[in-house]
UniProtKB/Swiss-Prot annotation:
Keyword Cytoplasm: no
NCBIfam families xrefs: ADH_synth, PRK07226.1
Family: Belongs to the DeoC/FbaB aldolase family. ADHS subfamily.
Top-level EC class as recorded in UniProt: transferase
SUPFAM superfamilies: Aldolase
UniProt name for this protein: 2-amino-3,7-dideoxy-D-threo-hept-6-ulosonate synthase
Active-site positions on this chain: D33 (proton acceptor), Y153 (proton donor), K184 (schiff-base intermediate with substrate)
Annotated GO MF terms: fructose-bisphosphate aldolase activity; hydro-lyase activity; transketolase or transaldolase activity
GO biological process: amino acid biosynthetic process; aromatic amino acid family biosynthetic process
Keyword Iron belongs to the record: no
Reaction(s) catalysed by this chain's protein: 1-deoxy-D-threo-hexo-2,5-diulose 6-phosphate + L-aspartate 4-semialdehyde = 2,3-dioxopropyl phosphate + 2-amino-2,3,7-trideoxy-D-lyxo-hept-6-ulosonate
Annotated binding of 1-deoxy-D-threo-hexo-2,5-diulose 6-phosphate, by residue: D33, H34, G35, V36, S37, Y153, P154, R155, G209, G210, G237, R238
CDD domains: DhnA (cd00958)
Length: 272
């Protein structure tokens, strides 16, 4: 894949091929790590059901904490990639923006992971600790040939707008500079400004799905715009696992990301 030409680690390349579509060179990831931060949300009470639905819908990978492997494993062979999330923090904490490391790259390998992810809140009062973790874990990932996804979110006392193009661009660049292979961050809400974010980041960017949108059309149009602006995929949780038709919305996203179909055409995948 051309976007990974700068990666010389064969182990990383092999694993990246498992979570990126060969033809489109893009990915659809379904994060399911919300149980740690927010508790047993609707759509995640039985992770195996949700994993089955998104796999049937064509998602390239699911992302979650190591408990996802035990409670959400399909047992159907390799039909969907696995990304182990290494960071944790809860809404019950005095500082919800603080994320700590709760597992290791080696543990993720034992669990069969195709990649690991790390959460960094850029601008949080403890952001320097998360920067340190990202830098050190990127070295471990390099040693083991494990792709690293950095979730770079502008959040903190000085952040007035989490979608501000300048702060999103800074957050994305920061993640790439500290060693991440893939960046997950906010879509700015506008294709032109997001193009500038992409230009300023040497690592491919996957957009976050964000809070649940009012309509499917609104959400899918965001995905469409982001892909045309240079995004290399989408990582969407609540807009997928809390949907009435999890398989259908996953398939609709895949149609846009991998086949570049129009939103109206993609909406036909949703049956409920």
């Amino acid at each position: 894949m051309k976007m990974f030409d700068n990666i010389k680690n064969v182990g990383k390349l092999i694993r990246l091929e498992r979570i990126f579509d060969k033809k489109s060179e893009k990915t659809v990831i379904i994060p399911m790590d919300h149980g740690v931060s927010s508790g047993p949300l609707d759509g995640l009470k039985d992770m195996r059901i949700t994993t089955n639905a998104v796999a049937d819908g064509g998602a390239n990978a699911v992302l979650g904490h190591k408990g996802l492997v035990r409670h959400g494993h399909r047992g159907y062979g390799r039909d969907i990639g696995l990304i182990i999330h290494m960071s944790a923090g809860t809404s019950l904490s005095p500082d919800p923006n603080k994320k700590v490391i709760v597992t290791t790259v080696e543990d993720a390998m034992r669990l069969g992971a195709d990649a690991v992810s790390l959460h960094v809140n850029v601008g949080a009062e403890t952001d320097f600790e998360m920067y340190r973790d990202l830098g050190l874990i990127s070295e471990t990932c390099e040693q083991w040939g494990m792709p690293l996804i950095a979730m770079m979110y502008p959040r903190g006392p000085k952040i007035e707008d989490e979608k501000d193009p300048e702060v999103v661009a800074h957050a994305a660049r920061l993640g790439a500079e500290l060693g991440a292979d893939i960046i997950k961050t906010n879509y700015t809400g506008d294709p032109d400004t997001f193009k500038e974010v992409v230009k300023g980041c040497p690592a491919p960017i996957v957009i976050a799905g964000g809070p649940k949108t009012n309509t499917d059309e609104e959400f899918l149009q965001m995905v469409k715009d982001a892909m045309h602006a240079g995004g290399k995929g989408v990582a969407s949780g609540r807009n997928v696992f809390q949907h009435k038709d999890v398989k259908g919305i996953t398939s609709a996203i895949c149609k846009i990301v991998h086949e570049d179909v129009e939103v109206k055409e993609a909406l036909k995948e949703i049956k409920i």
